[in-house]
Amino acid sequence: MLIPWEVWRDNLIQDAPESVARSIWEQLSPEPNQVNLDKLDLKRYYSLAIPKSFIYCRQDEAMGSGYFHPRMSSRLGAFDLLEMDGSHEVMFTRPRELADKLIEASSD
C-alpha cells in the first residue's frame, strides 16, 4: 500500500513546504497493510513497571483528531505527556525539537 500524495501532504506532513513533502513522498516504499490489521497481545507490555512518556504532536491529523491522544495514549496507564507542534512526520519537519522531546522523555 502506498499512501496517495494528497493524503500524505494534507494529513501526514502538512507542516512541511510542498517541495520537502514531495521529495520525502517520492522516497516512500509501499508496505503491506496487514501490519495495521494484525492483533497483538500487549497485556505484558502494558503491565511493565517502567516509566512511560507520550509525545503528542498537536497538528498530527494522520488518523483524525484525538486518535493518538487521548485514544491511544490512554492505554499506557500513568504516563508523562510531552507536547510539541508538528505533524505526524516531525522527524522530517522538526527533527531538533523531536530530539529534545525524546531526551526529555528519557529523563525520568
Mark where each language-model region is.
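Low-complexity, flexible helical/coil segments
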Residues: 1-12, 61, 87-94
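Helix-rich cap/lid subdomain of alpha/beta-hydrolase
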Residues: 1-46
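Short, conserved loop/helix-junction motifs that constitute active-site signature segments
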Residues: 43-49, 74-76
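Short beta-strand/loop motif that positions the catalytic acidic residue
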Residues: 47-48, 54-56
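Glycine-rich phosphate-binding loop signature in dinucleotide/nucleotide-binding domains
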Residues: 48, 105-108
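Conserved loop-alpha-helix segment in the C-terminal half of the alpha/beta-hydrolase fold
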Residues: 58-85, 92, 104-106
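Short, amphipathic alpha-helical "lid/cap" segments that border enzyme active or binding sites
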Residues: 95-103
